């Protein structure tokens, strides 16, 4: 189990990565930013138009009954790719939100690519 100081440092490092990544990414209506969030139990994603500061579409793994596993992330990626195509989006910018590109974050991105979304 981690103590409070270690948890604080872990979150601070993730926040620094998040700012470093987000400063280089910008999404618009034609190529939105796909931002992901993973909790210990669930996985979420949304497509964001940074120019209008609005969410184009989103997917909620908790409401759909998917857990935070690689298999479920692949299924969510396929469903999210369909939602993006319905909105007329073929290209996107992937924002891993400070998480390492590994595990469910990588599986979700690969699933988007396999289903026709250029990242």
Curated annotation (Swiss-Prot):
Biological processes, Gene Ontology terms: translation
Q: Which GO terms describe its cellular component?
A: cytosolic large ribosomal subunit
Q: Which domain of life is it from?
A: Bacteria
> Per UniProt, which keywords does this protein have?
Ribonucleoprotein, Ribosomal protein, RNA-binding, rRNA-binding
Q: Could you cite one Gene Ontology molecular function of this protein?
A: 5S rRNA binding
CDD domains with a match to the protein in the record: Ribosomal_L18_L5e
Q: Does the keyword Lipid biosynthesis apply?
A: no
Entries under InterPro entries matching the protein:
Ribosomal_uL18_bac-type (IPR004389), Ribosomal_uL18_bac/euk (IPR005484)
Record flagged with keyword rRNA-binding: yes
PANTHER family, sorted:
39S RIBOSOMAL PROTEIN L18, MITOCHONDRIAL, LARGE RIBOSOMAL SUBUNIT PROTEIN UL18M
According to its UniProt entry, what is the function of this protein? This is one of the proteins that bind and probably mediate the attachment of the 5S RNA into the large ribosomal subunit, where it forms part of the central protuberance.
The UniProt family comment states: Belongs to the universal ribosomal protein uL18 family.
Quote the NCBIfam families the UniProt record gives. Answer: L18_bact (TIGR00060)
Assembly notes = Part of the 50S ribosomal subunit; part of the 5S rRNA/L5/L18/L25 subcomplex. Contacts the 5S and 23S rRNAs.
- What HAMAP family does the record point to? Ribosomal_uL18_B (MF_01337_B)
Output this protein's name: Large ribosomal subunit protein uL18
> Whose protein is this, by species?
Helicobacter pylori (strain ATCC 700392 / 26695)
